[in-house]
Amino acid sequence: VPVRAAGERSTGAAKHHVVRKGDTLYSVAFRYGLDYKLIAEANNIDPPYTIYLNQKLALAKTKSRRAVQATKLRQKTVTRKSAGVTKNGRLSKSQSAKINWRWPVDGVVVNGFTLSGKVNKGVDIRGRLGESVGSAADGVVVYAGSGLRGYGKLVIVKHSDRFLSAYGHNQAILVKEGDKVKSGQVVAKIGSSGPNHEMLHFEIRKNGKPEDPLIYLPSR
């Protein structure tokens, strides 16, 4: 059975989230496919974005005027620099220079990214049980736990204000929240989603939204 790891069912009608044990602002945003910055703004939460058990968080469904203005500025900047995507769909060096992405494991991609049909918000990479999983870039661990249904033992790493990466279905987590990690540093060990299904579920999220990791990872 392919690993789909769509995460918890996204409830379009959900307007609030009550903080559970183990939640972080980043994991809450990840659960609902939202930008953590918008949730922070909607709830007047400042860095380092501490949330509390049973706290009721408003889920930002629309951007505030300030966020919209910031988005427009970013869009104008991108327009001036061009989209920066090559013919094969990968980012040009100028667009990906800020984050030097690397493959978290060396295995073959067995299930690709798709947001239609049987949704897969990342890629599933074949591996060996207990194989080391490396961080795809420098960053800070913002979630390490098993509180998101469909992901098993999950690690989320923040690489910038816009980009997060996620590593799911692990046998073991080797980092804790707040740890700074270097590109390639081992963060977990590959687990299994069922018999003969030893693989890593890997995602890249930009402003809270899942993106095809193959756009960012180096070709091989």
Q: Can you describe what each PLM-predicted range is?
A:
Residues 1-156, 160-163, 172-186, 192-197, ...:
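Extracytoplasmic low-complexity/disordered linkers and repeat tracts associated with LysM-containing
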Residues 201:
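Short, surface-exposed ligand- or partner-binding patches at beta-edge/loop junctions that are enriched
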Residues 219-220:
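Short, solvent-exposed mixed-charge patches
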